[in-house]
């Protein structure tokens, strides 16, 4: 897929996420690998109003190559890609219901959601709860790395999900 098409796809996905109420305001971010780096939604962007030309393009050390300044949570995406090299995309949201689950008392941090359906078990397996870190705290990347090798989805306490896929 061309970088131009990938940029359009990120914007379409962002709009879909926003229209379904899974993101509001300037919350959440989406990234995808391209031939010579990766694309990420810019800092402060609204997923419902993304501009393909303004997406951030970064190298594999997190250095901005072109576009607007990247989300301050770029390090989360990079941590997922480093641990899950076969995955081509990462989505991080602050969706209301997932944040609500992330603050519940008495949940099993090894698997925060019970296996409600067979499909959930087949697709997700278990969903670990990553302890709370302040937004932008680089220690969060290391905490995510600790789970990402075995899980393509994690739930950040008081924050929201990070999911890697193709």
Summary of predicted features, one role per range:
Residues 1-166:
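Glycine-rich flexible loops
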């Amino acid at each position: 897929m061309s970088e131009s098409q990938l940029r359009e796809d990120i914007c379409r996905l962002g709009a879909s996420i926003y229209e379904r109420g899974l993101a509001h305001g300037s919350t959440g971010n989406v990234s995808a690998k391209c031939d010579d780096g990766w694309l990420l939604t810019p800092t402060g962007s609204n997923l419902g109003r993304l501009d393909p030309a303004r997406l951030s393009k970064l190298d594999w050390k997190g250095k901005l190559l072109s576009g607007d300044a990247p989300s301050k949570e770029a390090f989360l995406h990079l941590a997922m890609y480093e641990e899950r090299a076969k995955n081509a995309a990462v989505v991080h949201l602050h969706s209301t219901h997932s944040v609500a689950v992330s603050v519940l008392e008495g949940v099993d941090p090894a698997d925060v959601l019970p296996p409600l359906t067979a499909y959930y078990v087949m697709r997700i397996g278990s969903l670990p709860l990553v302890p709370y870190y302040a937004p932008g705290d680089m220690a969060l990347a290391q905490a995510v790395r600790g789970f990402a090798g075995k899980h393509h989805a994690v739930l950040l306490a008081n924050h929201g999900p990070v999911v890697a896929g193709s």
